[in-house]
C-alpha cells in the first residue's frame, strides 16, 4: 500500500488534481446551488482562486445547508448541501479513493459505480441466466436507509488513505 498512498498524496496535493475537482464541481448539475456560505464559483477568476484555496492542512468542513424536497408519497426528504469548497474537497478525496475502491469492488455490482449503467446490469443478468449451470433466479434488493447504519469508524480504519486527511472524510 506504500505506492498507493504515495500516489494518493501526489494526486490530492497536485494543482491538476485540485483543478479537476473544481471543474467537476463547477460543471455539474448543482453548480449554481450554494451551501451555507452562499458562495458559488461561477466565473473563471473564482474557479482559479478556488483551485489555489484547496488545501488539506487546516481544512474543516462547513455545516450543510439543509433543504427538504417532496417525495412521491407526500413526505419530505432532507437534503444536505455542502459548500463549493467542501464539494471540491470531497471530489479530491474521490479521485484518490475511487481507483482503490474499483479494484476491490464486486464486479457484479452496478449501483453508483462509474462507467456502469442499468443496461450493463441487465446484460449481466442475461449472461448469467444463459449459462447452463447458472442459478434460475436473480434477486434485486433495496436496503432502506442503508447509509444511516454504515460505521464511519470501520470505513476510516479499512480504507487506505493518508491519516492526516482521513479525519476529514
Regions found by a protein language model. Name each.
Residues 1-169:
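Non-catalytic terminal/accessory segments
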Amino acid at each position: 500500500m506504500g505506492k498507493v498512498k504515495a500516489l494518493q498524496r501526489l494526486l490530492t496535493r497536485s494543482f491538476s488534481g485540485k483543478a479537476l475537482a473544481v471543474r467537476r464541481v463547477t460543471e455539474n448539475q448543482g453548480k449554481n446551488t450554494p451551501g451555507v456560505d452562499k458562495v458559488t464559483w461561477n466565473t473563471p477568476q473564482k474557479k482559479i482562486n478556488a483551485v489555489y484555496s484547496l488545501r488539506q492542512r487546516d481544512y474543516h468542513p462547513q455545516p450543510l445547508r439543509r433543504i427538504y424536497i417532496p417525495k412521491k408519497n407526500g413526505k419530505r426528504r432532507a437534503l444536505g448541501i455542502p459548500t463549493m469548497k467542501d464539494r471540491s474537497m470531497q471530489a479530491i478525496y474521490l479521485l484518490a479513493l475511487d481507483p482503490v475502491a474499483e479494484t476491490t469492488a464486486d464486479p457484479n455490482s452496478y449501483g453508483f459505480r462509474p462507467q456502469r449503467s442499468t443496461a450493463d446490469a441487465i446484460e449481466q443478468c442475461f449472461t448469467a441466466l444463459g449459462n447452463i449451470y447458472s442459478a434460475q433466479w436473480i434477486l434485486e434488493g433495496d436496503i432502506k436507509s442503508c447509509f444511516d447504519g454504515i460505521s464511519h469508524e470501520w470505513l476510516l480504519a479499512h480504507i487506505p488513505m493518508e491519516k492526516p486527511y482521513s479525519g476529514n472524510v
